[in-house]
């Protein structure tokens, strides 16, 4: 029978009696536990009792309470949804401020209280049947024993908690990553017909049909004719209606032969690369120290020859000398008029006209130098553009050996230092040329040695390009180096043939090669002077000479030419290279037309 409470006083007295019966089994001596440190905030000070708010309108089971008191057992006296701790108690304030969502604590017993998870709004000491004191079991009168299977949230160690949280975060992040990857996958469409693209083909995203069509077009005949106005619509449904417009659109969207992705590699290429890397790794592991030291000086027998059938490499020293002597250009006469006095314009006009005509014969001479004709057209143009003024100057110095203090520009044009004063800045160049001619005369340079030195200048001029050069370097450097070695051997053969000792041969070879650096310095000075004359419009330059001057400025650093650095455009580079190549073919005179025997 349930009765409604009419007064708080009677209810409170009965409540204290019930609580005393419930706490009677727990009134044992306090558990003395060794404590490594002071109690933390999870334990409540027992000196501060909690305030219990009596619920209004709560129902009390008198019969059940009396029966429970007589039997000495505990029983629930209030419903689970009616008893709560007062919000004004210190225990409630502690739980709200420090532990957030954890249940509030009471400090009735002197024993430490664990953080429990009771059902909602239930007192820790008023539980349903079978759930009273869930985490402590009474085994002995003087001690408590911890249950083996405690609540996971409380009895899991910190490391386990961290691992579990890490696994949860990992799984959630992987799920998010998968969702992001799925959303990142976008559908590609063909740039030609707007169909679904199957991949990146010939430089654009395209479908299999357009890829195959473009492949057939570039490999076979593509002389398609449009039956209309060359403006047909190319889409998924009408791409086969007009082959001409389809091919036109392929080119418009950027399809090109060889337009593949640079980062793409086939399985066969990767397999070969792995095999090659494994083989190189085994070779490196098995190589000893003395073999590594021997590799610093590779034997000529193990050098890979790219020009195995080059006739220049099979020539003997005498044959090389004979070929170089036969390739020498003829002497050219100038347009000098002795009746007219020299002026700056007239002298520069004579010299530039003479140099322009000599350039034509220089191209034909270079074609007949052993080994030069085996190079590709790019390397031939590159070497001539770098060495043309050095070759003209060493020829001038060689002709002037028999005329001390004078320079023989042509058989009918012999100038001394005083005559060079009429041109601004010419005296310095004249002095350097006269000093080199005097050095040749002192060394008694022979004609065979001269032709070898001139060939070395041609082949060695563009081998070591400047870092600031805008043009690409030589493509067949190995072949050029082998031809240079052949010419050096020819020089040594000539010295040995003249009866010089080994020490004298080495000394003379070093002296001759040192003169080449002086000629390079004179060439740079002459190029700078010629460019300044061009900028001042002192004399108009001829086509081939002007082209060679501009090409030389592209090879050399701009700061050396005395002008601020200027980055040439791609069109200028292409025009210069193509024009120079055209000049090699235009000004090339076959040896048979000049009456020179072709010995190569």
From Swiss-Prot:
Segments for region (Modulating (transactivation AF-1)): 1-189
Q: Where are the annotated segments for Mediates interaction with DNTTIP2?
A: 190-315
> May I have one GO cellular component term?
T-tubule
Region described as Interaction with DDX5: spans on this chain: 35-179
Residues annotated as region Disordered? Answer: 148-177, 558-581
Stretches for region Transactivation AF-2: 316-600
User: Composition bias, kind Basic and acidic residues: at what positions?
Assistant: 159-170
Question: Which protein, by its recorded name, is this?
Answer: Estrogen receptor
Q: What organism is this sequence from?
A: Rattus norvegicus
- What gene is it encoded by? Esr1
